[in-house]
Amino acid sequence: MVFTDPPYNVAIEGNVSGLGRTRHRDFAMASGEMTREEFMSFLSAALANLAAYSIDGSIHFVCMDWRHMGEMLQAGGANYSELKNLIVWAKDNGGMGAFYRSRHEFIFAFKNGSAPHINSFELGQHGRYRTNVWEYRGVNTLKAGRAEELALHPTVKPVAMIADAIKDVSKRGGIVLDVFGGSGSDPHRCS
């Protein structure tokens, strides 16, 4: 399975990091400098590699900001066999950088290939009731340890959210791939 958080091609510095003590600089690439065509090419190449180097039937969770959901749908459609669902991560606080403060992020659930995929929740049959709205506290929530987490990455994904996604579509001892390591949530959860 894949859980990955590619750059969103959105400026970070002065846009996402706000005015607090922790200020983030733009990423090395895909921080708003790419044209739509360049970003499409970037996403398509990344997704093509994810599909090529993962098993047939695997589920790939790919995070993306609402500003580039069209590009993600197009790149995903070109590289995956199916869009299984569009998941909304509903955070408890809105972020910066938009006309309305965004209190959500999208997670695209794509299927790679035609083999059967793992589904450990099957509409609640295994005691796991899951919907396509995932409610997890964002790191910008006022809590102990928040400053350290925010210092790692401007859009840190909650470890519990990634852990649940891993449980949904993989088995113990399976392989989890994240080619955009970001804040390190995946390796932390898989350990």
Regions found by a protein language model. Name each.
Residues M1-S191:
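Core catalytic lobe of class I
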